[in-house]
From Swiss-Prot:
Family: Belongs to the RimP family.
An individual GO BP term: translation
Matches recorded under PANTHER family: RIBOSOME MATURATION FACTOR RIMP
InterPro entries given in the database record: Ribosome_maturation_RimP, RimP_C, RimP_C_sf, RimP_N, RimP_N_sf
Keyword Manganese found: no
Cellular component, GO annotation: cytosol
Protein purpose: Required for maturation of 30S ribosomal subunits.
Gene: rimP
Subcellular location: Cytoplasm
Domain of life: Bacteria
Principal location: cytoplasm
Signal peptide: none
Protein name in the entry: Ribosome maturation factor RimP
Length: 151
């Protein structure tokens, strides 16, 4: 996670939790005037559109005061959904035995895109079983990770 994203998580965690939700994670996608700050909120009872709207208002107010992003951006707030993005070691740990897809910054076993079963988490290292091979991936090498939904 980039430094700005870490700062944003720290800044926005309390306002989201004050609404009774958990800040699951966030993504900041820089693209000039089309940059996006995407927050994922979660709750044991589920997330509804009203929850997203309320969190958006709360987060917007904090962002206006703190102003950590000097350029234009669009704020999006949503639930993580069934193919939820994974951001932390704790989140990967919670999905041991489940299938995930990860996009890497640097290749592991010759690939930047891996799909496999989470077999463990050791500190900041993710253990994945990919096509019968056990791979170890540093969490800071994961650009994007998502749970693969089972239906």
């Amino acid at each position: 996670m980039a430094t700005l994203e870490r700062k944003l998580v720290e800044m926005l965690k309390a306002p989201v939790e004050a609404l009774g939700h958990k800040l699951w994670g966030l993504e900041y996608i820089q693209a000039g005037k089309h940059s996006i700050l995407r927050l994922y909120i979660d709750n044991e009872k589920g997330i509804f559109i009203e929850d997203c709207a309320e969190a958006s208002r709360q987060v917007s107010a904090v962002m206006d005061v703190e102003d950590p992003i000097s350029t234009e951006y669009t704020l999006e707030v949503s639930s993580p959904g069934v193919d939820r993005p994974l951001f932390t070691a704790e989140q990967y740990q919670a999905y041991i035995g489940e299938t995930v897809k990860v996009q890497l910054t640097m290749p592991v076993a010759g690939s930047r895109n891996l799909k496999g079963t989470v077999t463990g988490v050791d500190g900041q290292m993710l253990n994945l079983s990919v096509d019968g091979n056990e791979l170890i991936v540093a969490l800071d090498n994961i650009r994007k990770g998502n749970l693969i939904a089972k239906f």
